[in-house]
Protein backbone atom coordinates (compact mmCIF):
# COMPACT_ATOMS: atom_id res chain seq x y z
CA UNK A 1 0.00 0.00 0.00
CA UNK A 2 2.75 2.58 0.77
CA UNK A 3 4.21 1.85 -2.66
CA UNK A 4 0.83 2.54 -4.27
CA UNK A 5 0.58 5.84 -2.39
CA UNK A 6 4.02 6.89 -3.61
CA UNK A 7 3.04 6.12 -7.19
CA UNK A 8 -0.17 8.13 -6.83
CA UNK A 9 1.78 11.03 -5.31
CA UNK A 10 4.22 10.99 -8.22
CA UNK A 11 1.37 10.92 -10.73
CA UNK A 12 -0.24 13.91 -8.99
CA UNK A 13 3.01 15.88 -9.10
CA UNK A 14 3.43 14.98 -12.77
CA UNK A 15 -0.08 16.24 -13.51
CA UNK A 16 0.64 19.54 -11.78
CA UNK A 17 3.80 19.82 -13.86
CA UNK A 18 1.71 19.10 -16.96
CA UNK A 19 -0.70 21.88 -16.03
CA UNK A 20 2.18 24.28 -15.42
CA UNK A 21 3.68 23.39 -18.82
CA UNK A 22 0.37 24.09 -20.53
CA UNK A 23 -0.01 27.44 -18.76
CA UNK A 24 3.53 28.61 -19.49
CA UNK A 25 3.29 27.51 -23.13
CA UNK A 26 0.28 29.77 -23.68
CA UNK A 27 1.35 32.86 -21.74
CA UNK A 28 4.90 32.92 -23.13
CA UNK A 29 4.08 32.22 -26.78
CA UNK A 30 5.13 34.45 -29.66
CA UNK A 31 3.03 35.99 -31.13
CA UNK A 32 1.32 36.92 -27.88
CA UNK A 33 -1.80 34.96 -26.96
CA UNK A 34 -4.70 36.31 -24.92
CA UNK A 35 -8.28 37.41 -25.33
CA UNK A 36 -8.65 40.73 -27.14
CA UNK A 37 -10.22 43.75 -25.49
CA UNK A 38 -13.88 44.17 -26.39
CA UNK A 39 -13.99 47.24 -24.11
CA UNK A 40 -14.18 45.90 -20.53
CA UNK A 41 -10.40 45.83 -20.03
CA UNK A 42 -10.60 49.61 -20.09
CA UNK A 43 -12.21 49.48 -16.63
CA UNK A 44 -9.16 47.87 -15.01
CA UNK A 45 -6.86 50.12 -17.06
CA UNK A 46 -8.71 53.07 -15.55
CA UNK A 47 -7.92 51.79 -12.04
CA UNK A 48 -4.17 51.25 -12.47
CA UNK A 49 -3.26 53.56 -15.36
CA UNK A 50 -2.01 50.83 -17.71
CA UNK A 51 -3.11 51.26 -21.33
CA UNK A 52 -2.49 49.60 -24.72
CA UNK A 53 0.56 51.03 -26.48
CA UNK A 54 -1.39 52.55 -29.37
CA UNK A 55 -2.23 56.08 -30.43
CA UNK A 56 -3.80 58.07 -27.60
CA UNK A 57 -7.05 58.38 -29.55
CA UNK A 58 -7.29 54.58 -29.78
CA UNK A 59 -6.55 53.63 -26.17
CA UNK A 60 -10.10 54.03 -24.93
CA UNK A 61 -11.63 52.04 -27.78
CA UNK A 62 -12.37 48.36 -28.11
CA UNK A 63 -9.94 46.17 -30.08
CA UNK A 64 -11.78 42.83 -30.31
CA UNK A 65 -9.98 41.64 -33.45
CA UNK A 66 -6.66 40.84 -31.74
CA UNK A 67 -4.87 41.34 -28.41
CA UNK A 68 -2.20 44.01 -27.98
CA UNK A 69 1.11 42.94 -26.42
CA UNK A 70 2.65 46.24 -25.30
CA UNK A 71 1.15 48.40 -22.56
CA UNK A 72 2.23 51.79 -21.25
CA UNK A 73 1.65 53.72 -18.07
CA UNK A 74 -0.82 56.55 -18.37
CA UNK A 75 -3.47 58.44 -16.51
CA UNK A 76 -5.77 56.81 -14.02
CA UNK A 77 -9.47 57.47 -14.53
CA UNK A 78 -11.07 56.90 -11.10
CA UNK A 79 -14.60 57.61 -12.32
CA UNK A 80 -14.35 54.69 -14.77
CA UNK A 81 -12.51 52.29 -12.44
CA UNK A 82 -14.16 48.91 -11.85
CA UNK A 83 -12.87 47.85 -8.44
CA UNK A 84 -11.91 44.18 -8.56
CA UNK A 85 -9.29 41.84 -7.15
CA UNK A 86 -7.94 41.78 -10.70
CA UNK A 87 -6.36 45.12 -9.78
CA UNK A 88 -4.01 43.30 -7.38
CA UNK A 89 -2.46 41.32 -10.24
CA UNK A 90 -2.42 44.33 -12.58
CA UNK A 91 -0.60 46.40 -9.95
CA UNK A 92 2.38 44.07 -10.24
CA UNK A 93 2.62 44.73 -13.97
CA UNK A 94 2.37 48.48 -13.33
CA UNK A 95 5.27 48.29 -10.87
CA UNK A 96 7.41 46.48 -13.44
CA UNK A 97 6.44 49.02 -16.10
CA UNK A 98 7.64 51.80 -13.80
CA UNK A 99 11.05 50.12 -13.60
CA UNK A 100 11.31 49.68 -17.38
CA UNK A 101 10.59 53.19 -18.60
CA UNK A 102 6.81 53.05 -18.39
CA UNK A 103 6.21 50.17 -20.82
CA UNK A 104 5.58 46.49 -20.18
CA UNK A 105 4.75 43.39 -22.20
CA UNK A 106 1.38 42.03 -21.11
CA UNK A 107 3.04 38.60 -20.87
CA UNK A 108 4.63 39.93 -17.67
CA UNK A 109 1.14 40.21 -16.23
CA UNK A 110 0.48 36.68 -17.47
CA UNK A 111 3.62 35.47 -15.69
CA UNK A 112 2.47 37.07 -12.43
CA UNK A 113 -0.87 35.31 -12.66
CA UNK A 114 0.73 32.01 -13.70
CA UNK A 115 3.02 32.19 -10.67
CA UNK A 116 0.00 32.71 -8.41
CA UNK A 117 -1.72 29.72 -9.99
CA UNK A 118 1.29 27.44 -9.62
CA UNK A 119 1.91 28.46 -6.00
CA UNK A 120 -1.75 27.83 -5.21
CA UNK A 121 -1.62 24.43 -6.91
CA UNK A 122 1.50 23.38 -4.99
CA UNK A 123 0.04 24.58 -1.68
CA UNK A 124 -3.21 22.70 -2.28
CA UNK A 125 -1.28 19.60 -3.32
CA UNK A 126 0.62 19.75 -0.03
CA UNK A 127 -2.69 20.14 1.81
CA UNK A 128 -4.15 17.06 0.10
CA UNK A 129 -0.96 14.98 0.19
CA UNK A 130 -2.20 12.77 3.05
CA UNK A 131 -5.23 11.80 0.98
CA UNK A 132 -3.91 10.37 -2.31
CA UNK A 133 -7.30 10.26 -4.02
CA UNK A 134 -7.96 13.93 -3.20
CA UNK A 135 -4.48 14.93 -4.34
CA UNK A 136 -4.94 13.07 -7.60
CA UNK A 137 -8.37 14.60 -8.26
CA UNK A 138 -7.00 18.07 -7.57
CA UNK A 139 -4.03 17.50 -9.89
CA UNK A 140 -6.33 16.30 -12.67
CA UNK A 141 -8.45 19.44 -12.34
CA UNK A 142 -5.35 21.64 -12.42
CA UNK A 143 -3.87 19.92 -15.48
CA UNK A 144 -7.05 19.54 -17.52
CA UNK A 145 -9.28 22.42 -16.44
CA UNK A 146 -7.13 25.23 -15.04
CA UNK A 147 -4.51 24.57 -17.74
CA UNK A 148 -7.07 24.64 -20.56
CA UNK A 149 -6.44 27.55 -22.97
CA UNK A 150 -10.06 28.67 -22.56
CA UNK A 151 -8.95 29.67 -19.05
CA UNK A 152 -5.27 30.49 -19.52
CA UNK A 153 -5.98 32.96 -22.33
CA UNK A 154 -7.35 35.25 -19.60
CA UNK A 155 -3.91 35.54 -18.00
CA UNK A 156 -2.44 37.91 -20.60
CA UNK A 157 -5.36 40.32 -20.19
CA UNK A 158 -6.88 42.89 -17.86
CA UNK A 159 -10.25 41.14 -17.77
CA UNK A 160 -11.73 40.29 -14.37
CA UNK A 161 -12.45 36.71 -15.44
CA UNK A 162 -9.04 35.45 -14.31
CA UNK A 163 -9.48 36.58 -10.71
CA UNK A 164 -12.92 34.93 -10.63
CA UNK A 165 -11.52 31.60 -11.84
CA UNK A 166 -8.46 31.79 -9.58
CA UNK A 167 -10.30 32.52 -6.35
CA UNK A 168 -13.12 30.09 -7.15
CA UNK A 169 -10.51 27.35 -7.68
CA UNK A 170 -8.83 28.05 -4.34
CA UNK A 171 -12.10 28.55 -2.45
CA UNK A 172 -13.71 25.31 -3.61
CA UNK A 173 -10.56 23.30 -2.88
CA UNK A 174 -10.36 24.76 0.64
CA UNK A 175 -14.07 24.11 1.17
CA UNK A 176 -13.50 20.41 0.58
CA UNK A 177 -10.48 20.41 2.89
CA UNK A 178 -12.46 22.08 5.69
CA UNK A 179 -15.98 20.68 5.41
CA UNK A 180 -14.97 17.13 4.46
CA UNK A 181 -12.31 16.65 7.13
CA UNK A 182 -12.36 13.18 8.65
CA UNK A 183 -13.23 14.22 12.21
CA UNK A 184 -16.11 16.67 11.90
CA UNK A 185 -16.38 16.82 15.68
CA UNK A 186 -12.96 18.51 15.88
CA UNK A 187 -12.28 22.11 14.80
CA UNK A 188 -10.79 22.85 11.39
CA UNK A 189 -7.29 24.27 11.45
CA UNK A 190 -7.56 28.03 12.15
CA UNK A 191 -4.98 28.92 9.51
CA UNK A 192 -6.96 26.97 6.92
CA UNK A 193 -10.13 28.83 7.86
CA UNK A 194 -8.35 32.18 7.57
CA UNK A 195 -7.02 31.30 4.12
CA UNK A 196 -10.51 30.18 3.14
CA UNK A 197 -11.92 33.54 4.25
CA UNK A 198 -9.27 35.41 2.24
CA UNK A 199 -10.04 33.38 -0.88
CA UNK A 200 -13.76 34.09 -0.45
CA UNK A 201 -13.03 37.81 -0.23
CA UNK A 202 -10.99 37.55 -3.44
CA UNK A 203 -13.83 35.72 -5.17
CA UNK A 204 -16.57 38.04 -3.96
CA UNK A 205 -14.66 41.13 -5.04
CA UNK A 206 -13.58 39.73 -8.42
CA UNK A 207 -16.79 40.78 -10.17
CA UNK A 208 -19.91 42.53 -8.97
CA UNK A 209 -22.08 39.60 -10.03
CA UNK A 210 -20.25 37.31 -7.59
CA UNK A 211 -21.30 39.21 -4.47
CA UNK A 212 -23.32 36.21 -3.18
CA UNK A 213 -21.15 33.39 -4.52
CA UNK A 214 -18.90 33.29 -1.40
CA UNK A 215 -22.01 32.64 0.70
CA UNK A 216 -22.95 29.66 -1.47
CA UNK A 217 -19.48 28.15 -1.04
CA UNK A 218 -19.04 29.07 2.63
CA UNK A 219 -22.33 27.73 4.01
CA UNK A 220 -21.31 24.03 4.01
CA UNK A 221 -18.02 24.92 5.70
CA UNK A 222 -19.75 27.04 8.34
CA UNK A 223 -22.26 24.27 9.02
CA UNK A 224 -19.50 21.68 9.44
CA UNK A 225 -17.66 23.95 11.88
CA UNK A 226 -20.76 24.90 13.86
CA UNK A 227 -20.44 22.64 16.88
CA UNK A 228 -16.68 22.31 17.43
CA UNK A 229 -15.83 25.88 16.37
CA UNK A 230 -18.93 28.03 16.65
CA UNK A 231 -17.02 31.32 16.77
CA UNK A 232 -15.07 30.45 13.60
CA UNK A 233 -18.29 29.52 11.81
CA UNK A 234 -19.94 32.79 12.84
CA UNK A 235 -16.84 34.69 11.76
CA UNK A 236 -17.00 33.04 8.33
CA UNK A 237 -20.65 34.02 7.95
CA UNK A 238 -19.82 37.59 8.97
CA UNK A 239 -17.14 37.69 6.27
CA UNK A 240 -19.48 36.56 3.48
CA UNK A 241 -22.17 39.00 4.63
CA UNK A 242 -19.62 41.80 4.63
CA UNK A 243 -18.51 40.84 1.11
CA UNK A 244 -22.10 41.06 -0.15
CA UNK A 245 -22.72 44.41 1.53
CA UNK A 246 -19.46 45.95 0.33
CA UNK A 247 -19.78 44.66 -3.22
CA UNK A 248 -23.46 45.42 -3.68
CA UNK A 249 -23.86 48.62 -1.68
CA UNK A 250 -20.50 50.23 -0.91
CA UNK A 251 -18.31 49.96 -4.02
CA UNK A 252 -19.05 52.70 -6.56
CA UNK A 253 -20.22 51.74 -10.03
CA UNK A 254 -20.16 54.05 -13.01
CA UNK A 255 -23.68 55.30 -13.85
CA UNK A 256 -23.24 54.21 -17.47
CA UNK A 257 -22.63 50.61 -16.38
CA UNK A 258 -25.75 50.67 -14.20
CA UNK A 259 -27.87 52.11 -17.02
CA UNK A 260 -26.51 49.66 -19.60
CA UNK A 261 -27.14 46.67 -17.34
CA UNK A 262 -30.69 47.82 -16.58
CA UNK A 263 -31.52 48.28 -20.24
CA UNK A 264 -30.08 44.90 -21.22
CA UNK A 265 -31.93 43.07 -18.43
CA UNK A 266 -35.30 44.82 -18.37
CA UNK A 267 -35.84 45.82 -22.00
CA UNK A 268 -33.66 43.16 -23.61
CA UNK A 269 -34.55 40.09 -21.52
CA UNK A 270 -37.41 40.42 -19.02
CA UNK A 271 -40.08 42.23 -21.05
CA UNK A 272 -39.61 40.03 -24.17
CA UNK A 273 -39.89 36.93 -21.96
CA UNK A 274 -43.12 38.05 -20.29
CA UNK A 275 -46.48 36.72 -21.45
CA UNK A 276 -47.99 40.09 -20.49
CA UNK A 277 -45.33 42.76 -21.07
CA UNK A 278 -47.72 45.59 -20.18
CA UNK A 279 -48.47 44.10 -16.74
CA UNK A 280 -44.78 43.36 -16.15
CA UNK A 281 -43.83 46.91 -17.08
CA UNK A 282 -46.48 48.26 -14.71
CA UNK A 283 -45.14 46.13 -11.85
CA UNK A 284 -41.69 47.54 -12.56
CA UNK A 285 -43.07 51.07 -12.41
CA UNK A 286 -42.44 51.72 -16.10
CA UNK A 287 -44.82 53.83 -18.23
CA UNK A 288 -46.45 52.27 -21.29
CA UNK A 289 -44.15 54.29 -23.54
CA UNK A 290 -41.33 51.95 -22.45
CA UNK A 291 -43.06 49.10 -24.29
CA UNK A 292 -42.05 50.85 -27.51
CA UNK A 293 -38.44 49.94 -26.61
CA UNK A 294 -39.16 46.33 -25.63
CA UNK A 295 -36.35 44.20 -27.03
CA UNK A 296 -33.82 47.05 -27.10
CA UNK A 297 -30.35 46.76 -25.61
CA UNK A 298 -27.78 49.38 -24.69
CA UNK A 299 -25.94 48.68 -27.95
CA UNK A 300 -29.05 48.25 -30.12
CA UNK A 301 -31.61 50.88 -29.02
CA UNK A 302 -33.80 50.24 -32.09
CA UNK A 303 -33.35 53.65 -33.65
CA UNK A 304 -34.38 55.63 -30.58
CA UNK A 305 -32.73 57.45 -27.71
CA UNK A 306 -33.56 55.45 -24.59
CA UNK A 307 -33.21 58.64 -22.56
CA UNK A 308 -36.36 59.88 -24.32
CA UNK A 309 -38.37 56.67 -24.81
CA UNK A 310 -37.75 55.03 -21.41
CA UNK A 311 -35.60 57.10 -19.04
CA UNK A 312 -37.16 55.36 -16.03
CA UNK A 313 -35.34 52.11 -16.75
CA UNK A 314 -31.90 53.72 -16.68
CA UNK A 315 -31.91 54.34 -12.93
CA UNK A 316 -34.10 51.44 -11.83
CA UNK A 317 -32.98 49.71 -8.63
CA UNK A 318 -31.93 46.07 -8.71
CA UNK A 319 -34.22 45.50 -5.73
CA UNK A 320 -37.24 46.30 -7.87
CA UNK A 321 -36.08 43.89 -10.57
CA UNK A 322 -35.51 41.14 -7.97
CA UNK A 323 -38.99 41.72 -6.51
CA UNK A 324 -40.50 41.43 -9.99
CA UNK A 325 -38.76 38.10 -10.62
CA UNK A 326 -40.04 36.74 -7.31
CA UNK A 327 -43.54 37.83 -8.25
CA UNK A 328 -43.28 36.44 -11.80
CA UNK A 329 -41.26 33.20 -11.52
CA UNK A 330 -42.45 31.96 -14.92
CA UNK A 331 -41.07 35.10 -16.55
CA UNK A 332 -37.74 34.42 -14.83
CA UNK A 333 -37.73 30.84 -16.12
CA UNK A 334 -38.48 32.00 -19.66
CA UNK A 335 -35.58 34.47 -19.44
CA UNK A 336 -33.26 31.57 -18.60
CA UNK A 337 -34.77 29.35 -21.29
CA UNK A 338 -34.34 31.97 -24.01
CA UNK A 339 -30.67 32.38 -23.13
CA UNK A 340 -29.93 28.64 -22.87
CA UNK A 341 -28.66 28.11 -26.47
CA UNK A 342 -26.13 30.95 -26.15
CA UNK A 343 -24.42 29.23 -23.21
CA UNK A 344 -22.89 26.69 -25.61
CA UNK A 345 -20.31 29.20 -26.85
CA UNK A 346 -17.35 28.12 -24.70
CA UNK A 347 -14.99 29.16 -27.50
CA UNK A 348 -15.62 32.96 -27.38
CA UNK A 349 -14.58 33.27 -31.00
CA UNK A 350 -15.64 36.92 -31.20
CA UNK A 351 -12.57 37.79 -29.12
CA UNK A 352 -9.41 37.44 -31.19
CA UNK A 353 -6.74 35.49 -29.31
CA UNK A 354 -3.52 36.01 -31.32
CA UNK A 355 -1.59 39.23 -31.67
CA UNK A 356 -1.86 40.84 -35.13
CA UNK A 357 -4.30 38.19 -36.42
CA UNK A 358 -7.97 39.04 -36.97
CA UNK A 359 -10.36 37.03 -34.80
CA UNK A 360 -7.99 34.07 -34.52
CA UNK A 361 -9.59 31.46 -32.27
CA UNK A 362 -8.86 28.21 -30.46
CA UNK A 363 -7.70 26.33 -33.55
CA UNK A 364 -5.20 29.05 -34.43
CA UNK A 365 -3.95 29.12 -30.82
CA UNK A 366 -3.29 25.40 -31.01
CA UNK A 367 -1.41 25.89 -34.28
CA UNK A 368 0.89 28.38 -32.53
CA UNK A 369 1.47 26.46 -29.29
CA UNK A 370 0.95 22.83 -30.27
CA UNK A 371 -0.27 20.03 -27.93
CA UNK A 372 -0.29 22.16 -24.72
CA UNK A 373 -3.07 24.26 -26.25
CA UNK A 374 -5.52 21.41 -26.83
CA UNK A 375 -8.82 22.71 -25.46
CA UNK A 376 -12.21 21.26 -24.65
CA UNK A 377 -13.92 24.54 -25.61
CA UNK A 378 -14.15 23.98 -29.41
CA UNK A 379 -15.45 20.46 -28.80
CA UNK A 380 -18.23 21.65 -26.48
CA UNK A 381 -19.12 24.50 -28.83
CA UNK A 382 -19.40 22.06 -31.75
CA UNK A 383 -21.67 19.57 -29.94
CA UNK A 384 -25.15 19.00 -31.38
CA UNK A 385 -27.39 21.47 -29.53
CA UNK A 386 -29.64 18.67 -28.27
CA UNK A 387 -26.66 16.91 -26.67
CA UNK A 388 -25.43 20.14 -25.08
CA UNK A 389 -28.94 20.76 -23.77
CA UNK A 390 -28.92 17.30 -22.17
CA UNK A 391 -25.48 17.79 -20.62
CA UNK A 392 -26.33 21.20 -19.20
CA UNK A 393 -29.63 19.87 -17.86
CA UNK A 394 -27.72 16.96 -16.32
CA UNK A 395 -25.49 19.42 -14.48
CA UNK A 396 -28.62 20.88 -12.91
CA UNK A 397 -29.64 17.36 -11.91
CA UNK A 398 -26.16 16.82 -10.48
CA UNK A 399 -26.51 20.02 -8.45
CA UNK A 400 -29.78 18.77 -6.95
CA UNK A 401 -28.41 15.28 -6.22
CA UNK A 402 -25.17 16.53 -4.67
CA UNK A 403 -27.01 19.12 -2.55
CA UNK A 404 -29.28 16.40 -1.16
CA UNK A 405 -26.28 14.16 -0.45
CA UNK A 406 -24.46 17.00 1.35
CA UNK A 407 -27.46 17.72 3.55
CA UNK A 408 -27.94 14.05 4.38
CA UNK A 409 -24.30 13.35 5.23
CA UNK A 410 -23.79 16.55 7.20
CA UNK A 411 -26.94 15.88 9.22
CA UNK A 412 -25.45 12.50 10.10
CA UNK A 413 -22.06 14.01 10.91
CA UNK A 414 -20.32 12.20 8.05
CA UNK A 415 -17.60 13.49 5.75
CA UNK A 416 -18.79 13.92 2.13
CA UNK A 417 -15.88 15.19 0.00
CA UNK A 418 -17.27 14.08 -3.37
CA UNK A 419 -20.74 15.50 -2.77
CA UNK A 420 -19.25 18.75 -1.46
CA UNK A 421 -16.98 19.19 -4.46
CA UNK A 422 -19.79 18.49 -6.92
CA UNK A 423 -22.21 20.78 -5.10
CA UNK A 424 -19.72 23.66 -4.98
CA UNK A 425 -18.75 23.26 -8.64
CA UNK A 426 -22.24 22.88 -10.09
CA UNK A 427 -23.67 25.46 -7.69
CA UNK A 428 -21.02 27.99 -8.73
CA UNK A 429 -21.69 27.23 -12.39
CA UNK A 430 -25.41 27.81 -12.12
CA UNK A 431 -24.90 30.86 -9.96
CA UNK A 432 -22.74 32.31 -12.77
CA UNK A 433 -25.36 31.47 -15.40
CA UNK A 434 -28.29 32.96 -13.49
CA UNK A 435 -26.46 36.13 -12.46
CA UNK A 436 -25.13 36.63 -15.99
CA UNK A 437 -28.61 36.70 -17.50
CA UNK A 438 -30.19 38.75 -14.73
CA UNK A 439 -27.14 40.97 -14.45
CA UNK A 440 -26.66 41.97 -18.10
CA UNK A 441 -29.32 40.16 -20.09
CA UNK A 442 -28.15 38.31 -23.19
CA UNK A 443 -25.31 40.69 -24.07
CA UNK A 444 -22.17 38.53 -24.19
CA UNK A 445 -23.92 36.04 -21.93
CA UNK A 446 -21.39 33.31 -22.67
CA UNK A 447 -18.55 35.53 -21.39
CA UNK A 448 -20.44 36.89 -18.42
CA UNK A 449 -21.28 33.29 -17.43
CA UNK A 450 -17.70 32.24 -18.19
CA UNK A 451 -17.08 30.86 -14.68
CA UNK A 452 -19.67 28.18 -15.42
CA UNK A 453 -17.50 26.53 -18.08
CA UNK A 454 -14.46 25.63 -15.89
CA UNK A 455 -16.74 24.69 -13.00
CA UNK A 456 -18.78 22.27 -15.10
CA UNK A 457 -15.65 20.88 -16.74
CA UNK A 458 -14.08 20.36 -13.30
CA UNK A 459 -17.24 18.65 -12.03
CA UNK A 460 -17.07 16.21 -14.95
CA UNK A 461 -13.38 15.51 -14.28
CA UNK A 462 -13.99 14.90 -10.56
CA UNK A 463 -17.01 12.71 -11.23
CA UNK A 464 -15.28 10.49 -13.78
CA UNK A 465 -12.05 10.30 -11.76
CA UNK A 466 -14.01 9.20 -8.68
CA UNK A 467 -15.24 6.13 -10.53
CA UNK A 468 -11.66 4.89 -10.48
CA UNK A 469 -10.99 5.65 -6.81
CA UNK A 470 -10.45 1.93 -6.00
CA UNK A 471 -7.42 1.97 -8.29
CA UNK A 472 -5.81 4.47 -5.91
CA UNK A 473 -6.72 2.63 -2.73
CA UNK A 474 -8.43 -0.68 -1.99
CA UNK A 475 -10.06 0.46 1.25
CA UNK A 476 -13.79 0.60 1.86
CA UNK A 477 -13.86 4.40 1.54
CA UNK A 478 -12.58 4.28 -2.05
CA UNK A 479 -15.22 1.73 -2.98
CA UNK A 480 -17.88 3.93 -1.43
CA UNK A 481 -16.57 6.89 -3.44
CA UNK A 482 -16.81 4.89 -6.67
CA UNK A 483 -20.35 3.76 -5.85
CA UNK A 484 -21.33 7.32 -4.95
CA UNK A 485 -19.88 8.59 -8.22
CA UNK A 486 -21.86 6.00 -10.17
CA UNK A 487 -24.97 7.04 -8.27
CA UNK A 488 -24.41 10.71 -9.05
CA UNK A 489 -23.87 9.88 -12.72
CA UNK A 490 -27.09 7.87 -12.87
CA UNK A 491 -29.11 10.49 -11.00
CA UNK A 492 -27.81 13.39 -13.08
CA UNK A 493 -28.39 11.51 -16.34
CA UNK A 494 -31.93 10.56 -15.33
CA UNK A 495 -32.83 14.04 -14.15
CA UNK A 496 -31.05 15.59 -17.12
CA UNK A 497 -32.95 13.39 -19.54
CA UNK A 498 -36.29 14.37 -18.03
CA UNK A 499 -35.39 18.04 -17.89
CA UNK A 500 -34.04 18.13 -21.43
CA UNK A 501 -37.33 16.68 -22.72
CA UNK A 502 -39.21 19.41 -20.87
CA UNK A 503 -36.82 22.01 -22.27
CA UNK A 504 -37.23 20.73 -25.83
CA UNK A 505 -41.00 21.00 -25.54
CA UNK A 506 -40.79 24.45 -23.99
CA UNK A 507 -38.42 25.69 -26.71
CA UNK A 508 -41.02 24.75 -29.31
CA UNK A 509 -43.62 26.94 -27.61
CA UNK A 510 -41.68 29.85 -26.14
CA UNK A 511 -40.47 32.58 -28.55
CA UNK A 512 -36.76 31.75 -28.81
CA UNK A 513 -35.52 33.75 -31.80
CA UNK A 514 -32.83 36.39 -31.52
CA UNK A 515 -31.88 39.05 -34.00
CA UNK A 516 -31.14 42.67 -34.78
CA UNK A 517 -32.47 45.23 -37.23
CA UNK A 518 -29.49 47.43 -38.01
CA UNK A 519 -31.09 49.53 -40.76
CA UNK A 520 -32.72 51.97 -40.62
CA UNK A 521 -30.38 53.41 -38.01
CA UNK A 522 -32.86 56.20 -37.19
CA UNK A 523 -36.62 56.11 -36.97
CA UNK A 524 -37.09 59.50 -38.63
CA UNK A 525 -36.79 58.71 -42.33
CA UNK A 526 -37.53 60.23 -45.76
CA UNK A 527 -41.01 59.60 -47.18
CA UNK A 528 -39.68 57.01 -49.62
CA UNK A 529 -39.38 53.21 -49.81
CA UNK A 530 -37.72 52.10 -46.58
CA UNK A 531 -35.32 49.18 -46.37
CA UNK A 532 -35.04 47.04 -43.24
CA UNK A 533 -31.92 44.88 -42.94
CA UNK A 534 -30.50 42.76 -40.14
CA UNK A 535 -30.08 39.18 -39.01
CA UNK A 536 -32.19 36.57 -37.24
CA UNK A 537 -31.52 33.17 -35.66
CA UNK A 538 -33.68 30.54 -33.97
CA UNK A 539 -32.66 27.24 -32.31
CA UNK A 540 -34.97 25.22 -34.56
CA UNK A 541 -34.18 27.28 -37.66
CA UNK A 542 -35.83 30.33 -39.22
CA UNK A 543 -38.73 29.74 -41.59
CA UNK A 544 -39.45 33.40 -42.38
CA UNK A 545 -38.92 36.99 -41.31
CA UNK A 546 -41.83 39.41 -41.62
CA UNK A 547 -42.51 43.10 -41.10
CA UNK A 548 -45.94 43.69 -39.56
CA UNK A 549 -47.34 47.23 -39.41
CA UNK A 550 -50.06 48.75 -37.25
CA UNK A 551 -52.34 49.01 -40.32
CA UNK A 552 -52.08 45.21 -40.74
CA UNK A 553 -49.70 45.38 -43.67
CA UNK A 554 -47.36 42.35 -43.85
CA UNK A 555 -44.10 42.45 -45.79
CA UNK A 556 -42.12 39.24 -46.18
CA UNK A 557 -38.37 39.66 -45.93
CA UNK A 558 -35.81 37.90 -48.06
CA UNK A 559 -33.96 35.62 -45.62
CA UNK A 560 -30.81 33.53 -46.00
CA UNK A 561 -28.37 36.28 -46.94
CA UNK A 562 -24.74 36.51 -45.80
CA UNK A 563 -24.22 38.80 -42.83
CA UNK A 564 -21.11 40.43 -41.40
CA UNK A 565 -20.67 42.45 -38.22
CA UNK A 566 -19.47 46.03 -37.86
CA UNK A 567 -15.84 44.92 -38.33
CA UNK A 568 -16.59 42.49 -41.13
CA UNK A 569 -16.60 39.50 -38.77
CA UNK A 570 -18.82 36.48 -39.29
CA UNK A 571 -21.94 36.08 -37.16
CA UNK A 572 -20.77 32.54 -36.37
CA UNK A 573 -18.16 34.02 -34.04
CA UNK A 574 -20.96 35.16 -31.73
CA UNK A 575 -23.59 32.42 -32.10
CA UNK A 576 -21.82 29.26 -33.27
CA UNK A 577 -24.46 26.77 -32.12
CA UNK A 578 -27.43 28.18 -34.08
CA UNK A 579 -28.50 26.67 -37.42
CA UNK A 580 -28.13 28.72 -40.61
CA UNK A 581 -25.78 31.14 -38.85
CA UNK A 582 -23.70 31.64 -41.99
CA UNK A 583 -26.74 32.92 -43.91
CA UNK A 584 -28.81 34.66 -41.25
CA UNK A 585 -29.18 38.04 -42.94
CA UNK A 586 -32.48 39.43 -44.17
CA UNK A 587 -33.75 42.42 -46.12
CA UNK A 588 -37.28 43.76 -46.53
CA UNK A 589 -38.66 46.92 -48.11
CA UNK A 590 -41.64 48.93 -46.96
CA UNK A 591 -43.25 50.76 -49.88
CA UNK A 592 -43.46 54.55 -49.70
CA UNK A 593 -47.25 54.38 -49.55
CA UNK A 594 -46.99 52.71 -46.13
CA UNK A 595 -45.61 56.00 -44.76
CA UNK A 596 -48.35 58.13 -46.29
CA UNK A 597 -49.99 58.95 -42.94
CA UNK A 598 -46.67 60.16 -41.51
CA UNK A 599 -46.15 57.65 -38.71
CA UNK A 600 -46.10 53.88 -38.76
CA UNK A 601 -45.53 51.25 -36.09
CA UNK A 602 -43.47 48.37 -37.46
CA UNK A 603 -42.67 45.09 -35.75
CA UNK A 604 -40.10 42.61 -37.08
CA UNK A 605 -41.27 39.04 -36.52
CA UNK A 606 -39.19 35.87 -36.86
CA UNK A 607 -41.16 32.75 -37.68
CA UNK A 608 -39.46 29.57 -36.47
CA UNK A 609 -39.64 26.27 -38.31
CA UNK A 610 -41.71 25.04 -35.36
CA UNK A 611 -44.22 27.82 -36.09
CA UNK A 612 -43.39 29.98 -33.06
CA UNK A 613 -43.36 33.71 -33.73
CA UNK A 614 -40.84 35.98 -31.99
CA UNK A 615 -40.74 39.76 -32.13
CA UNK A 616 -37.13 40.95 -32.35
CA UNK A 617 -37.66 44.65 -33.09
CA UNK A 618 -40.37 47.29 -32.85
CA UNK A 619 -40.22 50.86 -34.11
CA UNK A 620 -42.37 53.92 -34.59
CA UNK A 621 -41.28 55.20 -37.98
CA UNK A 622 -41.84 58.90 -38.65
CA UNK A 623 -41.71 60.23 -42.22
CA UNK A 624 -39.92 63.55 -42.66
CA UNK A 625 -42.04 66.43 -43.91
CA UNK A 626 -40.43 68.99 -46.20
Region roles according to the model:
Residues 491, 495-626:
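Basic, ligand-binding patches in group-transfer machinery
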Residues 100-118, 339-425:
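Membrane-interface anchor segments at the N-terminal boundary of transmembrane helices
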Residues 63-103, 110:
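Short hydrophobic/aromatic helix or loop-helix immediately within or flanking a transmembrane segment
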Residues 191-207, 219:
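Membrane-interface alpha helices of multi-pass inner-membrane proteins
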Residues 163-183, 200:
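Specific aromatic-rich, kink-prone transmembrane helix
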Residues 43-78, 252-364:
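Membrane-proximal stem/loop segments at transmembrane-domain junctions that anchor or position
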Residues 2-5, 213-241:
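Perimembrane helix-loop-helix junctions
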Residues 111-132, 170:
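Transmembrane-helix motifs of polytopic, lipid-linked glycan transferases
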Amino acid sequence: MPERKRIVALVAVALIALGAWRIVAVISATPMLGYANQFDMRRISACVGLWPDVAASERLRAHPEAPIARYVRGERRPDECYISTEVVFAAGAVAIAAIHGGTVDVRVLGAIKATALLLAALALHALFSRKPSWALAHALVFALVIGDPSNTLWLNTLYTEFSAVFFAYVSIALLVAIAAREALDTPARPRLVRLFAVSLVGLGLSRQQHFLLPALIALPAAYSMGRPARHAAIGLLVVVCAIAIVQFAALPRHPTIISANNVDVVLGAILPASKDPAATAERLGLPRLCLQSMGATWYEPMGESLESTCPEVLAMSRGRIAALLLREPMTALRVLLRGWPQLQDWRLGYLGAIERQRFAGAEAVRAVVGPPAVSVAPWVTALPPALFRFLLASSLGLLAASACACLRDMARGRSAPLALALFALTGSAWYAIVTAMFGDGYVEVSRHAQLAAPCLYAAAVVLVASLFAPLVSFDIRSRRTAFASAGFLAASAALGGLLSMVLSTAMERVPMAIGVVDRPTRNIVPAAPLEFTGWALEPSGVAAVELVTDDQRLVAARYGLPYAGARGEALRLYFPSYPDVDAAGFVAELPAVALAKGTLDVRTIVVAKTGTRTEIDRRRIVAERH
